[in-house]
Amino acid sequence: MKVLAIKLVDYREWTERLGYDREWLIQKIQNKFMMKIHEIASQYSTFPLQLRFDNFLMIVDGITNTQLIYMINDMQENLPVGIKTCLGYGKTPLEAQWNASVCLNNKEDKFKEYVDEKIAALHFDINFNTEALKYTSLYDSFLEITNIYVDLSRFLYKIGGILQYLGGDNYLGFVSTNSVNKVIEKFSDDNKIKVGIGIGQNARTAIKLATTSLEKIRNNREKTWHIEEEYH
């Protein structure tokens, strides 16, 4: 699988130049440029995992190196600092992002040609969380969501996957297609978490299919998982 690692250059120095009354401004600018990056990424059929805001990842199977260069140039035009990128390859998203991260710090070829793989996206949703908000505080609910995020991250890490919190009680994960059965086995009898699985040629399609799967689960309350796959 192919993962693009993106690092904002001199990001800390940029934030320090904003003065002491800066945190509100940093949040404003971060959200503004991430909104633009999401828009650009969608045009190239991928999706940014925001991570720390100054570093993020993209699953880029199904995208040519030429398209990647165009996308990077488009992003650079909308960022307040420079960026450094590198393309990594691995049998799993976790391995690919590791290789991409290491590549950021050396002088090897940044864009080798790699074979595209199908992408498996996972859209996780917590059962009854909205209803539970009536009986707990906003902060306690947030802590529960955070704990679940940690648990899901650890599980996916063990099978070579990566995870992003989407907001609310939703999470987005990526695994290799070879690991899908492990996800199904894990959540087939789970009455707390449902997972929509989408398999596609690129990240945007896989995510769309994962969300489609999740909606089908919601319409059939007896199921905890469903899978949709793109065929060519």
UniProtKB/Swiss-Prot annotation:
InterPro entries recorded: GTP_CycHdrlase_3, Nucleotide_cyclase, Rev_trsase/Diguanyl_cyclase
Its EC number(s): 3.5.4.29
Gene3D superfamilies the record matches: 3.30.70.270, Nucleotide cyclase (3.30.70.1230)
Molecular functions per Gene Ontology: GTP binding; GTP cyclohydrolase IIa activity
Top-level EC class: hydrolase
Catalytic activity: GTP + 3 H2O = 2-amino-5-formylamino-6-(5-phospho-D-ribosylamino)pyrimidin-4(3H)-one + 2 phosphate + 2 H(+)
Biological process, per Gene Ontology: biosynthetic process
Keyword GTP-binding on entry: yes
Keywords of this entry: GTP-binding, Hydrolase, Nucleotide-binding
Domain of life: Archaea
The keyword Transmembrane helix is annotated on this UniProt entry: no
Family classification: Belongs to the archaeal-type GTP cyclohydrolase family.
HAMAP family tied to this protein: GTP_cyclohydro_3
Function in brief: Catalyzes the formation of 2-amino-5-formylamino-6-ribofuranosylamino-4(3H)-pyrimidinone ribonucleotide monophosphate and inorganic phosphate from GTP. Also has an independent pyrophosphate phosphohydrolase activity.
Name this protein carries in UniProt: GTP cyclohydrolase III
Species: Saccharolobus islandicus (strain Y.G.57.14 / Yellowstone #1)
Name of the gene this protein is made from: gch3
